[in-house]
Every structure is written in C-alpha cells, then in structure tokens.
C-alpha cells in the first residue's frame, strides 16, 4: 500500500477502512467488489487504487491493520493478573466493544478472514491470522483450568463462542447497531454459561 494513506485526515481513513471492512465481511473475498467499497466510502475507484493498488492490496492491508489494532485493544482491556476464564472472556468482549465503536465490522472481518478459502486471500493473510490467534491464545492461556472445567466444558465453551459471534454478526446487519448494547447482551450470555459451570462444580 501507499504509506501516504496515513497522511489523509483520520475521518477519511476510517471511512475507507470501515467501508472495506464491511464489504469484505459481508461478502467474503471472492464476492466483495471494489465498486461496492468505493460506493460505501463515497470515494472514487482511482483514489482507492492510488493507495492500495488492487483488491488484494486492500484486503491484505485490512488484515494487517485489524490484527494490530485489535491486539492493542486487547492489551488495554486485559488484566494480566486475572485467572478466571469467564472474567477474562468479559475483558475480551470489552476489547471487542471498544474496537467496534470505531470499526464496527472489524471483528466480523477477522472472523470471515479466518474462514476464507480463496488462495490469493489465504496467502496474503497467513501471518495476520497467526498474529491474531497468538494474541487471543496468550490471553486465554492465563485462565486457570478449574474455572472452566466440567463434564461438558468443551461443548459449553464452543456454544458460547458461536452464540456470541452469531449474535454480534446478526446485529451488525442492523443499521441501529450499538457496540455498548451488544457488549451488555454478550456479557449476559457469558454469565449464563458461567452459572452452568458453578452448578456442575
């Protein structure tokens, strides 16, 4: 990408980033259109390609920017002394909320990027996927096993992850999406699952 992109006013940078995040998140790499990105961002295609050269250039920039941005939000939101899995989970959700206040579709984009199977997109984002997974993995590695152990622990935790992801992505499609309201709803689901572990212990 052209480093002069960062010389643009922050509002214009974010408008372009948010437009691209949204289009790629909703459509995946293969079906995302640069025409839709420039329409969403209210810019010309010439300007988009001036800074990013190509569709894959935009996509790889988003992958790098998203992985780094969310890692910073995680580092701000996480108490490194906390060992309870569900309290850590809430901190991660707080980091996601803070991220989505500025970039509503960033986590949605990251989730679709992890599942992307287009060869060019996969090759361009391999390192960023590792960076994201390492950041998340480091956070959860601090959790003490007894805080989430039980006969159905794996199923419960997978169900929780899938529920939070689906809820957030479903609500993002609604123009009235609010990051703080989404955070509160997600925390309520975390509390439900945490309660199940307490009953089983």
Where in the sequence are the language-model features?
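Amphipathic alpha-helical packing segments from all-alpha helical-bundle domains
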Residues: 68-79, 119-145, 154-158, 184, ...
């Amino acid at each position: 990408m052209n480093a002069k992109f960062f010389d643009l006013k922050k509002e214009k940078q974010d408008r372009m980033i948010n437009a691209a995040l949204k289009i790629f998140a909703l459509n995946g790499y293969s079906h995302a259109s640069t025409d839709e990105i420039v329409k969403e961002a209210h810019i010309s295609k010439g300007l988009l390609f001036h800074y990013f050269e190509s569709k894959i250039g935009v996509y790889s920039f988003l992958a790098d920017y998203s992985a780094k941005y969310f890692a910073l939000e995680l580092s701000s939101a996480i108490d490194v002394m906390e060992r309870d899995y569900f309290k850590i989970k809430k901190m991660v959700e707080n980091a996601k909320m803070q991220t989505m206040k500025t970039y509503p579709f960033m986590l949605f984009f990251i989730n679709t990027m992890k599942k992307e199977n287009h060869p060019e997109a996969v090759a361009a984002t391999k390192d960023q996927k590792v960076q994201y997974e390492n950041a998340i993995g480091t956070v959860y590695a601090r959790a003490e096993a007894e805080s989430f152990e039980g006969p159905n622990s794996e199923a419960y935790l997978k169900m929780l992850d899938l529920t939070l992801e689906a809820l957030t992505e479903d609500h993002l499609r609604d123009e009235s999406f609010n990051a703080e309201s989404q955070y509160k709803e997600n925390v309520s689901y975390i509390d439900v699952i945490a309660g199940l572990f307490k009953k089983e212990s």
